[in-house]
């Protein structure tokens, strides 16, 4: 079956992903209390459901997809951002 992914879906995922890096995700200048950094892809999530997953900015992105690309931060990403906002990271 052919899966159509719109340019807008891809653009949103990439923009949110890069914005996450600008905010410091994942483990850029801090150490997360959560073990969610991919050891093979530094500063990226090991959760395929997170917009911070490494394949979002990779050619492998298209090979990894079996649906719409993730465009939201996962629970650990959001918790890291909240802890940074509170000055706890």
Language-model features and meaning:
Residues 2-78:
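The catalytic-center signature of Zn2+-dependent metalloproteases
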Residues 78-89:
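Pan-zinc metallopeptidase signature
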């Amino acid at each position: 079956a052919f899966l159509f992914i719109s340019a807008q879906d891809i653009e949103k995922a990439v923009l949110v992903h890069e914005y996450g890096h600008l905010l410091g995700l994942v483990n850029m200048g801090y150490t997360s209390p959560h073990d969610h950094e991919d050891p093979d892809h530094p500063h990226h999530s090991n959760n395929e459901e997170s917009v911070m997953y490494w394949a979002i900015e990779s050619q492998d992105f298209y090979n990894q997809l079996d649906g719409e690309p993730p465009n939201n931060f996962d629970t650990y990403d959001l918790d890291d951002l909240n802890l940074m906002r509170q000055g706890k990271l």
